[in-house]
Swiss-Prot record:
Residues 537-540 are cytoplasmic. It comes from Oryctolagus cuniculus. SMART domains: PD (SM00018), ZP (SM00241). This is Zona pellucida sperm-binding protein 4. Expressed in oocytes (at protein level).
């Protein structure tokens, strides 16, 4: 089966039984005309902005919001990991650690909302401007292995000495205080945008396996002399070229100008009458620099977009999918065969997990198509009740199914192998006029498919689905194989009938013989009282 296509390997499984900011009550802040310059460091934001108020002469203040929507003035705060200081000229520099009180993790970015508070003509403090700072959570900065693996004789200087370790690492380079070349390139691709409007791209031969032939690395659209590497050694090749040359494209988006170019390594191909081979890696690299048009020429950010790794080879084979019921909403444990039948009251939640077993391929995805319930093991048995329709909660239920996002965790390394949802327990009604509740088990059925690669359109479902396509009927696809598992059942405990409830609270049941004894005793007592009364009257 070809990669990228949906693999309809499994059919039916049967089992018995943001960054959000609070609204501030003040005029809506504007986006500043000068958005400032943001540097995404390996450990923090570095944000430089020129915001001197020329009209009032007052000194505006940088502010931010916590996750409760409360406003805070930014200052030097060790506990919250923020530092505010003067920059060049009339600018202010903010540094905020990614672990700061005001930084939120919004995969795959660290984000922080920053505002400018000024005094208006009436003397009121107002937040007049705001800027959302966003840095990737995983910067392409070299780790220790990429740095230590570069032999001393192969180290290519990344910056001229002297340079601090902080400034060196900000360039994405390695630092060693023991070597002459204290700041050098690691065994990776290191790219940055210069203030003068140039791309700087260093490529290590060990960025791929097998190693690259560096003499084959070139700019896709650049053949001029200025597009050739400025430095070429046996271990590295360095390109330095302006945005106005070498086929660089320019695109204006809002207040930003985005420049892009592409590097490519030519593969050596051997051909004979019966075929062709190559022993070279595929290397294609797209880089982009983003600049603010209205501010200075400092780059706003830099992106290196490499090709995704090739999809794994696929071949036919067994694949196991299981449907389990969790004991709690956190999915810490599941009911086993020995735990059934599981008794549930009406409206009790049932937490369902459908997962692929015994696979470690991160590109596999699991997709739920239809899920429904029947009072028998037969999935075609009537009556039926839809739970998921085309992967989305059935909208005709007043207790709608809740889709539960699956996050990567230590005990859940492949979240794409799982689909989770919760339902509220219910009881089927018979077809009579009285609509009596059917006591007994409820059986849950799902149709699923395993798809590849995860994250593509064939592997994802967007809810709510188009109303024109919404249909509660259960449709079986001819290309889907059907399998069933006769599992244990979930018994639904019926609600008490009012007459049963009255009987339940009327006291301990009385034997009929005891009622006769009590009656005769009462007659004798009444008779004795009458005789005593007559005797007393006679004496008088």
């Amino acid at each position: 089966m070809a990669p990228g296509s949906t693999m309809w390997l499994l059919g039916y499984i049967f089992l018995c039984f943001p960054v959000s900011f609070a609204l501030i009550k003040q005029p809506k802040p504007e986006t500043p005309t000068d958005p400032g310059v943001l540097h995404c460091r390996p450990w923090n934001f570095k944000f430089t902005i020129n915001f001197q108020n020329q009209e009032t002469g007052s000194s505006p203040v940088l502010v931010t919001w916590d996750n409760q929507g409360r406003l805070h003035r930014l200052q030097n705060d060790t506990d919250c990991g923020t530092r505010v200081g003067e920059g060049p000229g009339p600018s202010v520099v903010l540094e905020a650690n990614y672990s700061s009180c005001y930084v939120t993790e919004s995969e795959p970015y660290y984000v922080m909302l920053v505002g400018v508070e000024e005094v208006d003509a009436a003397g009121q403090n107002l937040v007049t401007k705001q800027q959302l700072l966003k840095c990737p959570m995983h910067l392409p900065a070299p780790d220790a292995g990429l740095c230590d693996s570069v032999p001393v004789q192969d180290r290519l200087p990344c910056a001229t000495a002297p340079i601090s370790q902080e400034d060196c690492e900000e360039l994405g380079c390695c630092h060693s205080s023991e070597e002459v070349n204290a700041c050098y390139y690691g065994n990776t691709v290191t790219s940055h945008c210069t203030q003068e409007g140039h791309f700087s791209i260093a490529v290590s031969r060990n960025v791929s396996s097998p190693p690259l032939h560096l003499d084959s690395v070139h700019l896709v659209f650049g053949n001029d002399s200025e597009c050739q590497p400025v430095v070429a050694t046996r271990a590295f090749v360095l390109f330095l070229f302006p945005f106005t040359a070498c086929g660089t494209t320019r695109q204006i988006t809002g207040d930003r100008a985005i420049y892009e170019n592409e590097l490519l390594a030519t593969r050596e191909v051997r051909t004979w009458s019966r075929g062709s081979i190559t022993r070279d890696s595929i290397f294609r690299l797209r880089v982009s620099c983003s600049y603010s048009i209205s501010s200075s020429a400092l780059p706003v950010d830099m992106h290196v977009l490499t090709l995704p790794p090739p999809l794994p080879e696929t071949q036919p084979g067994p694949l196991t999918v299981v449907l389990q019921i969790a004991k709690d909403k956190d999915y810490h444990s599941y009911y086993t065969m020995d735990d059934y039948p599981v008794v549930k009251l009406l409206r009790d939640p049932i937490y369902v997990d459908v997962s692929i077993l015994y696979r470690t391929d991160p590109y596999l995805g699991l997709r739920l198509h239809q899920c429904w319930a029947t009072p028998r093991t037969n999935p075609l048995y009537q009556p039926q009740w839809p739970i998921l329709v085309k992967g989305c909660p059935y909208t005709g239920d007043n207790y709608q199914t809740q889709l539960i996002p699956v996050q990567e965790a230590f005990d859940l390394p492949f979240p794409s192998h799982h689909q989770r949802f919760s339902i509220s327990t219910f009881s089927f009604l018979d077809s009579s006029v009285a609509k009596e509740a059917l006591k007994g088990p409820i059986y849950l059925h799902c149709s699923v498919s395993v798809c590849q690669p995860t994250g593509t359109q064939s592997c994802t479902v967007t809810c709510p689905i188009d109303s024109r396509r919404r249909n509660s009927d259960i449709n079986f696809q001819n290309s889907t194989a059907n399998i069933s598992s006769k599992g244990p059942m979930i018994l639904l405990q019926a609600t008490e009938d009012p007459s049963e409830k009255l009987h339940k609270h009327s006291g301990v049941p009385v034997h009929p013989g005891a009622l006769w004894v009590a009656g005769l005793s009462g007659i004798f007592i009444i008779g004795a009282l009458l005789v005593s009364y007559v005797a007393i009257r006679t004496r008088r």
